[in-house]
Amino acid sequence: MRRHPLLWKLALLQVGFCLLLTWLIYTWGLSVERSTYFLAPADRHYLADYARQAEDAWRREGAAGAERFRKELSAKEDTWVALVGPHLESLGSTPLSAEESSHLTFMRKLDWPMSRRLQDELPYVSIEFPGHPEQGRLVIQLPERLLPGGLTPWTHLVTHGIVPTLLAALLGLLLYRHLVVPLNRLRDRADALRADELESTPLAAPLAARRDELGELAQALEHMAERLRLSLAQQRLLLRTLSHELRTPLARLRIAHDSELPPEQLRQRLDREIGDMQRLLEDTLDLAWMDTERPQLPTEPVLALSVWEALRDDACFESGWDPARLPCRLGVDCRVEVHLDSLAQAMENLLRNAIRHSPEDGTVSLDGEREGDFWHLRLQDQGPGVAEDQLERIFLPYQRLDDSAGEGFGLGLAIARRAIELQGGRLWASNGKPGLCLHLWLPAAA
């Protein structure tokens, strides 16, 4: 079941954008709008000074002073004014009417936002006496000239138009960088492959390392490019090697054809040369198939001892060796999870190679032990061994050491390694004491 990480990334990005836009409009935008409804510091000081003057008049002259100041301020600002006590009673000589008392039901302080009330009525501001706030306050209907202007069309455009547009543009940029830029790189890479530019610069590591569909696509594209490079290299190597390797048997066939050998000897010579060419072609096709197709081979539990015994019988028949020279120290508990035919082919190549390089009275043995979920098998011969710097070279196709020129085509070990690796195992070599030791690392059967 696919998790669709790219879908979740895009969904999360869009949800985050919607939440940010909602916060912008309903929190930041409203906060900016509310900030335009507060009195300016100078206006606050101006009204607070009226409260100080009202307190002074009331304390000096009592109700008469409060009434006089109320009338003067009302006439000066052309607005409604009242001086009230702690219980909202009038401090002047004129009591408040019912309508005037209704103005006191919702009064605003100087640091509150100011806006028109219902029916376009100016707000009423309550300003406590600065000296003794518990004894009274000045209540004044805010003069028209002091009413804050509120949200201007330009501010509204910035908070509800320009900034959201910039956020939308930022979202588009993020989507472009997250989607379009990688797609452009993938397109350029595909165009390079279409133009046979197989050695062009591979995709950047961050793109191939992405844990989403685009990262998987980049990995698949690079895998395809690598397969194409390997296929092309193998084709070139195949053509170059076949053209070189076939020259020798063809030349020998030409010599045999032109010679005056007896018919029976000529037939044997032709059979040997044709067999060599057939073996070369079969091995080359096997190696090319494993390298290019990389098949998923079905596996089964296999008893390693049984495979060795079958190979030993064939090897003894072909080489004339005594079976005692091919001992196996594995028990019936050595069961590996492999493809039987591929393992048999690989071990046959290894055994033939070991016999070919063994001395006349030498032995080739097979032993091993289980290490965790794998079996570590060792095929040991008593031949001359291989130089340390050549231990990896012997597994390369068509590679023959100087002292083995003319023996085989250099494909046996390469085919064996490919066959083992296709089954999840490993094959490597080390020098024994004496001879060469070939190590097989195979999955253990459950």
Swiss-Prot record:
Entry annotated with the keyword Transferase: yes
Q: Which InterPro entries match?
A: HAMP_dom (IPR003660), HATPase_C_sf (IPR036890), His_kinase_dom (IPR005467), HisK_dim/P_dom (IPR003661), HisK_dim/P_sf (IPR036097), HK_sensor (IPR031930), HK_sensor_dom_sf (IPR038428), Sig_transdc_His_kin-like_C (IPR004358)
* The keyword Membrane belongs to this UniProt entry's keyword annotation: yes
EC code? 2.7.13.3
Q: Its GO CC terms?
A: plasma membrane
Q: Supply the name of the protein.
A: Sensor protein PfeS
An example GO BP is:
phosphorelay signal transduction system
What are the UniProt keywords, alphabetically?
Answer: ATP-binding, Cell inner membrane, Cell membrane, Kinase, Membrane, Nucleotide-binding, Phosphoprotein, Transferase, Transmembrane, Transmembrane helix, Two-component regulatory system
Periplasmic side of the membrane: what ranges? 31-155
List residues modified as Phosphohistidine: H244
